[in-house]
Curated annotation (Swiss-Prot):
Name of the protein in question: Bifunctional uridylyltransferase/uridylyl-removing enzyme
Catalytic activity reported: [protein-PII]-L-tyrosine + UTP = [protein-PII]-uridylyl-L-tyrosine + diphosphate; [protein-PII]-uridylyl-L-tyrosine + H2O = [protein-PII]-L-tyrosine + UMP + H(+)
GO terms classed as biological process: nitrogen fixation; regulation of nitrogen utilization
Annotated function: Modifies, by uridylylation and deuridylylation, the PII regulatory proteins (GlnB and homologs), in response to the nitrogen status of the cell that GlnD senses through the glutamine level. Under low glutamine levels, catalyzes the conversion of the PII proteins and UTP to PII-UMP and PPi, while under higher glutamine levels, GlnD hydrolyzes PII-UMP to PII and UMP (deuridylylation). Thus, controls uridylylation state and activity of the PII proteins, and plays an important role in the regulation of nitrogen fixation and metabolism.
Regulation (activators, inhibitors): Uridylyltransferase (UTase) activity is inhibited by glutamine, while glutamine activates uridylyl-removing (UR) activity.
Gene: glnD
GO terms of molecular function: [protein-PII] uridylyltransferase activity; phosphoric diester hydrolase activity
Family: Belongs to the GlnD family.
The protein's required cofactors: Mg(2+)
Taxonomic path: Bacteria, Pseudomonadati, Pseudomonadota, Alphaproteobacteria, Hyphomicrobiales
Keyword annotations from UniProtKB, A to Z: Hydrolase, Magnesium, Multifunctional enzyme, Nitrogen fixation, Nucleotidyltransferase, Repeat, Transferase
EC numbers, comma separated: 2.7.7.59, 3.1.4.-
Residues spanning the signal sequence: none
Keyword Nucleotidyltransferase carried by entry: yes
Length: 931
């Protein structure tokens, strides 16, 4: 407690004249003698003006020296001085005690983050007013005078008033209050009263309760991470409360102060918890995070703790980052951020492991949080190696020089921990990080080291072990190409994690695929059992490396294939398997692109895809890789619709690769899908069921997943029973962040454009669309729009408005351009990005249609603009394939001219391309549809 010396002036902050301000307040007291309200108002006006000036100076200094901790110290110093001046004004000019008694004493104390002596620009102020006994009229008046003045200055203040006895009693029973008192710092008033609180807190609360406190703080940390997303590599991190953020450093220091009774982090070196290098790392991480946080508050003008996309670039510029080939300035900044978050995680792990190692009987929560293993007290040799021991269920070194005398041990230790289900002793973690210089060319080329690495990659719980290798730096040093993408973020809204975290997560999902039993991975799991045994290692290394060349000027798929050709022979792969890995990496986006943006019922599409994959075995491997890749992007990206598209593409292509396009095989799959559907509707009359099945074309039965088919059937039946010409069914998918609208109506040449326009008029952004026409001329379209409201009821009302708009347009009661003109502009997140517009037109993917593929920055109403523009170009849209990847929209249209022919004339294609490029490049300018 009280780690910042009162009245200490931060370096380079002479602009705030505390003594001059105090004298000015005294002068105001004389000027307004007997007029309390006028005196208060004058003091508030004076101090508020000085605070504004001081904040401006602090921000200017931050932009100049980029030192966030100094900025936080300056802001805290100013706030301290203001509170001291207010206390003096209250006790000397407003409520001077006429008959001082023992009860008329008070200490004003900073608590919480403010108590640490560091303050972000928009942070709250937490104050504790300490009294010797119960509250008195004098104490209440003084506290209120200070609080009301602070509130009148526009500051956010949290406060409590307690006696010393009350503080001690509440601290015993409330961990939040206990932590707040742990971080108290004296500001003004009766110093002996504060000292009494500190002394009694140490002897009556802290003593003998270290294990309880540590367990509670680690449980809080675990719950905070669970709420905010377990990974420290989420690409819009919370600087304060996120994993690897400032709160983790605070938790670390709370524990250190409580257990070791230290006041400064430097004392942890003397206690043997950190070495000098780790202490410097702690300071460096804290300084960086404070720089980010202070800039974040200044830029946003609010207590914003989330480093969102729309703020990241400005923060990067303020911190001096510049763009390099292959990496934007913002990506370099965020890479630094995630490297710091990784180091914070390492420091926390070291402290927690050290604590558990020193506790004879660690608390159950502590043991569970840190190791999730049973606690033992003996040590023994690790099987298979005399260089390592097991100490308290943690792997440790048998001698200090085990890495030096055999550098292969730097890989072996991870394999032994994996095989024996062991956590890492803190001394072993330190030894590993200090020995990274031993990972040189000789070790990288060592056959034993590479064999051990492949065993790690292809054995149980590879995700956990690879993450530990990554966090200690071993993975990036052993596979240098991987080291280049450690903590690298991609500045887009599609990827949820840094590149290295994405790859490691993909390995985890690959192992789930291999274990089987998960419906969403059914096809991939089935194929995993059918690939050649020698290709198991091929798929594992392909998954690990598929994005390893991100951030280079060259296309990452092509560059990644080159990396694989250099690396795989070292890892023990023969020439054929090396080429297979390179091919998988080079084509790892192909299957996803074809499945989501092409007409899978078009024979030409299937033949072109078959020409790419070349063999059933390669298609099996590519399907597995694609599944793991999409699933590893982030929550809600993989869904049943995408799984069904991959399944359809796989089974449509398989006959082509095994001796010709087999309609029999295809017919069997259609029959099987219809039989599966029949089994779900045993309560329907046979003739009604047959009629309904006959209303759908083969593509519907092959491409739509069973649960959706069931929902469609019930929806269509209910709509027709009710006699609705137009019906809309609303479904909610919070996991994907979308609301789905299924529209059943008579088909209409402009229906897709009308639906898109209606969504735009409601400010709804279309992120996915599944469009089908029945044999009797009805449209059955499912549109996924970005979720705007937290409550389903509010989303439902928005969907109702969209339905009403569609109906009014179809009935001629509403002009769609008028409705669209009032639509919402795109959100602030999208404004942070720029996407180069692209349009491609070709006749190679279809025998009957010209395929137009457009890609550009997504915005509300874009699909409406595109469909309208295409229709105005005298083109008929036969089918559309709509998808968004974060901020990027990628829409594909199968079109003909008005006579039903492909667009072959180069001049016509050029005109179409020019018109669509102009539309994509425009900023929220809607095309006007025909009347």
């Amino acid at each position: 407690m009280d780690s910042v010396t009162p009245n200490s002036r931060p370096e380079s902050f002479p602009e705030f004249d505390s003594a001059g301000l105090a004298a000015a307040v005294d002068a105001l007291a004389a000027q307004h003698s007997g007029r309390e309200d006028m005196f208060r108002a004058a003091v508030v006006q004076l101090l508020k003006a000085e605070l504004v000036k001081a904040r401006a100076v602090a921000q200017a200094q931050l932009l100049k020296d980029r030192h966030g901790r100094r900025c936080a110290e300056r802001l805290c110093f100013v706030q301290d001085e203001i509170i001291r001046i207010l206390y003096a004004a209250a006790t000397q000019h407003l409520y001077r005690s006429q008959v001082p008694s023992g009860a008329e004493r008070m200490a004003v104390v900073a608590t919480g983050g403010y108590g640490r002596g560091l303050m972000a620009p928009e942070s709250d102020i937490d104050l504790l007013f300490i009294l010797p006994y119960k509250q008195t009229a004098w104490g209440e008046q003084v506290a209120e005078a200070i609080l009301y003045s602070l509130w009148d200055m526009g500051l956010k203040v949290g406060h409590a008033t307690r006696s010393v006895d009350e503080s001690i009693r509440q601290a015993r029973g409330d961990m939040t209050i206990r932590t707040a008192i742990l971080e108290t710092r004296y500001l003004a008033g009766d110093r002996p009263l504060y000292d009494e609180l500190v002394e009694r807190f140490d002897t009556e609360v802290v003593q003998g309760t270290a294990a309880e406190f540590v367990a509670a703080k680690l449980a809080e940390r675990e719950e905070r991470h669970r709420r905010g997303g377990q990974s420290r590599y989420l690409v819009e991190p919370n600087v304060k409360d996120g994993k690897g953020g400032l709160r983790d450093l605070h938790t670390l220091f709370w524990i250190a102060k409580y257990v070791y009774r230290v006041r400064e982090t430097a004392e942890l070196v003397e206690r043997g918890v950190f070495d000098a290098h780790e202490y410097r790392t702690f300071r460096r991480c804290a300084d960086f995070l404070w720089s980010v946080r202070c800039n974040l508050h200044f830029v946003s003008g609010r207590p914003e703790e989330r480093l969102s996309f729309d703020l990241q670039r400005e923060i990067a510029v303020r911190l001096g980052y510049t763009s390099h080939p292959g990496m934007q300035d913002v990506e370099r900044f965020m890479k630094h951020y995630f490297l710091v978050a990784k180091e914070v995680g390492n420091l926390t792990a070291i402290l927690c492991a050290k604590l558990e190692d020193q506790q004879a009987k660690p608390a159950p929560v502590l043991s569970r949080v840190i190791s999730r293993l049973k606690t033992g007290n003996s040590w023994r040799r690790v099987p298979e190696s005399d260089d390592f021991i097991v100490d308290n269920n943690r792997i440790n070194l048998a001698a200090p020089d085990v890495f030096k005398h055999d550098p292969v041990n730097l890989i072996r230790i991870f394999r032994l921990a994996q095989k024996n289900n062991l956590a890492f002793h803190p001394d072993a973690m330190r030894a590993v990080t200090r020995s990274l210089n031993l990972i040189n060319t000789e070790l990288r080329d060592n056959p034993d080291a590479n064999r051990l690495f492949m065993e790690i990659l292809t054995s149980n719980d590879a995700e956990t072990v690879l993450r530990r290798m990554n966090e200690t730096g071993v993975l990036g040093h052993f596979i240098r190409a991987f080291g280049r993408i450690v903590s690298m973020m991609q500045f887009n809204m599609y990827h949820h994690y840094t590149v290295d975290e994405h790859l490691i997560r993909c390995i985890g999902f690959l192992q789930e695929i291999e274990r089987g039993g998960i419906d969403e991975f059914a096809l991939a799991s089935d194929l995993m059992r059918k690939i050649r045994p020698e290709h198991r290692a091929v798929i594992y290394i392909s998954v690990l490396l598929h994005d390893v060349a991100k951030g280079r000027p060259e296309d990452h798929s092509i560059a990644g294939a080159k990396v694989a050709r250099r690396l795989c022979p070292r890892l023990g792969f023969n020439n054929a398997d090396t080429e297979l890995v390179a091919w998988l990496i080079e084509e790892h986006l192909t299957m996803s692109t074809v499945a989501q943006s092409r007409d899978l019922s078009d024979r030409r599409t299937i033949e072109k895809f078959a020409a790419v994959v070349q063999s059933v075995e390669q298609m099996k491997l590519l399907t597995i890789l694609t599944t793991a890749d999409i699933r590893g992007v982030g929550p809600g990206v993989w869904n049943g619709w995408k799984a069904q598209l991959l399944r359809t593409l796989y089974y449509e292509t398989e006959p082509v690769l095994t001796g010709g396009f087999s309609e029999v095989n295809r017919a069997k799959r259609i029959t099987a899908a219809q039989a599966e559907f029949r089994n779900a509707f045993t309560d329907w009359p046979e003739d009604e069921l047959n009629t309904y099945i006959g209303r759908h074309y083969p593509a519907y039965w092959l491409k739509v997943e069973l649960p959706r088919k069931i929902r469609h059937a019930r929806f269509v039946r209910a709509s027709e029973d009710a006699g609705h010409k137009l019906a809309i069914n609303v479904g909610f998918d919070p996991a994907r962040g979308v609301t789905e609208l299924t529209i059943f109506a008579m088909d209409h040449p402009w229906l897709l454009s009308i639906i898109a326009g209606a969504c735009a008029s409601a400010g709804a952004n279309i992120v996915d669309a599944q469009i089908y026409t029945t044999t009797d001329g009805r449209a059955l379209d499912t549109i996924a729009i970005s979720r705007e409201y937290e409550r389903d009821e509010d989303e439902g009302r928005r969907a109702t408005r969209i339905g009403e708009t569609i109906e009014q347009v179809l009935e001629g009661k509403l002009r769609l351009p008028d409705a669209v003109a009032r639509r919402t502009t795109r959100g602030k997140q999208h404004k942070a990005f720029s996407v180069e517009p692209e349009v491609s037109i070709n006749n190679q993917w279809s025998e009957l249609y010209t395929v137009i593929e457009v890609s550009g920055l997504d915005r509300p109403g874009l699909l409406y603009e595109l469909t309208t523009a295409i229709s105005k170009l005298n083109l008929n849209i036969a089918s559309a394939h709509v998808a968004t990847f974060g901020e990027r929209a990628r829409d594909v249209f199968y079109v003909t001219d008005l006579l039903g022919a492909q667009i072959n004339a180069p001049t016509r294609q050029a005109a179409i391309k020019s018109a669509l490029l102009h539309l994509l490049a425009s900023d929220d300018t809607a095309a006007q549809p025909a009347a």
